[in-house]
Amino acid sequence: MKFSKVSLLAASASVALSAPVAVTVTQHVHQAATVVVQGIVRVENGQTLTTFITKGTQTASASPVATTSAPIVVANAQVDSIATSVIQESAVVAESATFEESSTETSEAFSTATATIQAVQTSASATQDDVTTTLTSSTQPTSTTTPTTTTTSPTTTTSPTTTASPTTTASPTTATTTQSTASSTQSSSSDFSTSMVNEHNTKRALHKDTGSLTWSDTLATYAQNYADSYDCSGNLVHSGGPYGENLALGYGTTGSVDAWYNEITSYDYSNPGFSESAGHFTQVVWKGTSEVGCGLKSCGGEWGDYIICSYKAAGNVIGEFADNVMPLA
């Protein structure tokens, strides 16, 4: 084993007065056996003595070392560097002048340790390769394709959802169509109710002390049910219900209100009372009426739209015309 004389002399000088001996055991793990090299550095009679003792059975074939050797550590830092160089360098012990002066025990220990250290150093390069290979091999599970396969599985699993989509899509489509139709119907109904109540209030506003009407869904439902039952024959027959009522055919929506109101020309304010020729007009402007609701049926062709409006409270009450049919403002 080759040592630097300068290093050895420096170590010898520095540890001459060193405190108690520090012992480090370096263990080399092989596949078939374990060899333990024990290095002891001590100061005796002013001389620095180093003893190496091999424990365990030495294996002839150099097997890959699983772990790297730890350096021999002693109390003095300079001796530590010497011990490290002993592990790292391989040569004949006799070449070291310093160790020639050591005791026979030391020389024998070096001779015994040399073969062991050479075997360890011979396998050092293989150890590094094996360690690298082992690390690479142990790292492989991290990059294994199993997670990728697992990740792909959910994608495949979602396929039934995609397959089910047409059914789900068809349902919203139907729902959307239904909603659109309902929305359109509601919008049309809203437009109809707004236009009808506004047209009534426009006419009522022309008369003194005559308030506006409000739309009643209850009256509108009653009127619409009766309109739906109309046979579009051209004959107009009153429903006979509890509300005041005006009917029209072929005038359109607001056109019906206009036609009813135009009967004002037949009303005699000087002789207030009911008249067949002015009955629709008096119901439209009846002061005591506060609610209105109308129904519509399209007969098409010759007759056009059938309109029915129901009123609450009912107008045309005998004996109350003077108080409820107010003159123009």
Curated annotation (Swiss-Prot):
Q: Where is the composition biased (Polar residues)?
A: 122-131
Chain segments carrying region Disordered: 122-197
Q: Which Gene3D superfamilies does the UniProt record give?
A: CAP
A biological process (GO) annotation for this entry? sexual reproduction
> GO CC terms on record?
endoplasmic reticulum; extracellular region; extracellular space; fungal-type vacuole
- What residues does the SCP domain cover? 197-311
One Pfam family hit: CAP
Family of the protein in this entry: Belongs to the CRISP family.
Would you tell me the protein name for this molecule?
Answer: Protein PRY2
Organism of derivation = Saccharomyces cerevisiae (strain ATCC 204508 / S288c) (Baker's yeast)
Report the gene name: PRY2
